[in-house]
Amino acid sequence: VIEIGFGSGSNIGLYPAEVTEIVAVEPSDLAWELSASRRSGSTVPVSRVGLDGARLPLDDASVDTGLVTFSLCTIPDVAGALAELRRVLRPGGTIGFAEHGLSPDPAVARWQHRLDGLQQRLFGGCHLTRDIPELLADQGFQVDLLHQDYLPGPAPSKPWGYVSAGRASA
């Protein structure tokens, strides 16, 4: 499994027993350090292969599965990262994703567009206005399973809480 945006390793305990290796792409040295205890407690080996999802040091069709959780919002070259992910996936490979992004509700989307610049400046480049299913389709992924909804919370949290989660095949 290649995990783009490995972060502090919070997904390690969620991998099924069939996973034999986790290849982590994580640009933050601090996040990588924070993942040390989770990595050391894992029965699955974890290796950090890169800092930039748009330039993966892996062979074509060398990975079975990908995972991206709450990372596509901050990747500067998100199209390049998804193209690279597709390149390294074996034919028929799939990715799991859970990402926040652009709401289909015009009123919420207007607020997302208004807040996007400030959001990026305050939160490490995080975008509110990325249409996740569209980004996946634009890079040749077929979205096979998709659930979209708002996270629980008060109405003012909606610009930050529209989530797309699912599975896509290469």
Residue ranges and their predicted role:
Residues 2-55:
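Class I SAM-dependent methyltransferase SAM/SAH-binding core
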Residues 29, 100-105, 149-151:
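Short "lid" loop at the C-terminus of a central beta-strand within the Rossmann-like core
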Residues 54-66:
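A short acidic, Gly/Pro-enriched loop at the edge of an enzyme's catalytic core
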Residues 64-77:
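A short SAM/SAH-binding and catalytic strip from SAM-dependent methyltransferases
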Residues 79-91:
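A short glycine-rich, Lys/Arg-flanked "PGG" loop and its adjoining helix->strand segment in the class I
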Residues 92-100:
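Conserved beta-strand signature within the Rossmann-like core of class I S-adenosyl-L-methionine
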Residues 124-140:
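Short alpha-helix
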Residues 147-170:
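Core SAM-dependent methyltransferase catalytic element
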